[in-house]
């Protein structure tokens, strides 16, 4: 007996959909929400989004964020866009994120973690604050920890494939824009930074190799 259409998968085919996930955070100062505990110092938002701000609810059913157990009702279920939540706190911790896909997908949920970042990174060499690569309209007093990823659906069922094809969700812009920094341009910039870093490390290794050689053989 042939499998029902909902479970019939399209062999040797994969479909990808880009997402960004992460958090923004800033010190509350005197603007403390009325229900925030007195020891909380930061206001933060964690999210799962499309890199260009497009709708992703056509293939994502819900997103579940599991916060630190000290929060009331730490398991937060977001069943409609935007898939995000805002809270207050004083410390950084791991947030478990689970993405559930549309019912017709017949796909398992996607499970991963994000380290909630409240404080900026300080470059140990320059002693200056390092800004995130995603600099799209981020105030100076705001911390942003955002990551790009692609969800890969291998051999999707026919109905889900049709759903995914109903919207062009895999377009990747060539250049950065004020509202979308993730692009081929950013990808190339990251590759260039890696090459520069690799050359620097190779140079330092050669220096240490020479020092080690001289230490072992003073006549070298």
UniProtKB/Swiss-Prot annotation:
- Signal peptide location: none
Kindly list the places in or outside the cell where this protein is found, as annotated in its UniProt entry.
Cytoplasm; Nucleus
Q: Name one GO biological process term.
A: regulation of DNA-templated transcription
Residue intervals passing through the bilayer = none
Does the keyword DNA repair belong to this entry?
yes
Location of the YEATS domain? 9-167
- InterPro entries in UniProt: YEAST_sf, YEATS, YEATS_dom
Q: Which UniProt keywords apply?
A: Activator, Chromatin regulator, Cytoplasm, DNA damage, DNA repair, Nucleus, Transcription, Transcription regulation
Q: What's an example GO cellular component term for this entry?
A: cytoplasm
Q: What's one Pfam family the UniProt record gives for this protein? A: YEATS
* Record note on quaternary structure: Component of the SWR1 chromatin-remodeling complex and of the NuA4 histone acetyltransferase complex.
Q: What is this protein for, i.e. what is its function?
A: Component of the SWR1 complex which mediates the ATP-dependent exchange of histone H2A for the H2A variant HZT1 leading to transcriptional regulation of selected genes by chromatin remodeling. Component of the NuA4 histone acetyltransferase complex which is involved in transcriptional activation of selected genes principally by acetylation of nucleosomal histones H4 and H2A. The NuA4 complex is also involved in DNA repair. Yaf9 may also be required for viability in conditions in which the structural integrity of the spindle is compromised.
Family stated for the protein in its record: Belongs to the YAF9 family.
What this protein is called in its record is Protein AF-9 homolog
User: From which organism does this entry originate?
Assistant: Kluyveromyces lactis (strain ATCC 8585 / CBS 2359 / DSM 70799 / NBRC 1267 / NRRL Y-1140 / WM37) (Yeast)
Q: Tell me what gene encodes this.
A: YAF9
